[in-house]
């Protein structure tokens, strides 16, 4: 139980971190664009951020339980099905609550013209306004984007239905769609912000002024070509070796290759 608690912490922290991004992080930049965090650790553990942490934890626990449904049998599979159904509903409820809460909270919007081809200069050159409900601006201007939060609602409900019907493959697919909807919804809400500053909004990091140098980007590109390829090959091999349900007979027959 202690190991499970420790392993759950990254999922919780991930949501807490994104919850703080949506509220703005207290930091400032000097003339060299070096950032200084001006807040406290405990200020990061605010109610909205903790709600986002619960959302992240529920979402990832649900996805893990969906995977267990496909890989296990008997009592363990039944427990995974129960966790899936509860987790999917918790994910849906916390997602809706966070959305409603966010509609009343201050968001950030760029009010000046941005030169997308200019050199990165996050410390100056833009104007940012703080407005209530600003994170819904992209959705209101492009109604088609509401498809992403709708995907969360539909995906979570269908996850429960598929799990109850013992259709584990479909349940896993709906869990994937739910996670994609949550992540894309948050990204669309913040666009083009990467990290807004709550103390100096004009120094917020945007997509166009938070980039690295051309040399670093080129180096990262070639490294990604190599190491992502290796990761994909290893992951494909791992899934091939672990294909099928795990039960006592499977473990006994493959005791040399599974460990």
Predicted features and spans:
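Short, small-residue-biased leader/transition segments that mark boundaries at the very start
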Residues: 2-6
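Loop-centered beta-sheet repeat module
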Residues: 40-91
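Juxtamembrane interface elements at the cytosolic ends of transmembrane helices
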Residues: 18-33, 54-76, 158-159, 234-247
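Short, membrane-exposed interhelical loops at transmembrane-helix boundaries
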Residues: 125-130, 197-217
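Membrane-helix interface motif
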Residues: 18-34, 101-119, 191-200
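Membrane-interface interhelical connector segments
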Residues: 106-141
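Hydrophobic alpha-helical membrane-insertion segments
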Residues: 7-17, 88-108, 173-189
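Membrane-interface transmembrane-helix boundary segments in multi-pass integral membrane proteins
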Residues: 82-89, 136-146, 208-226
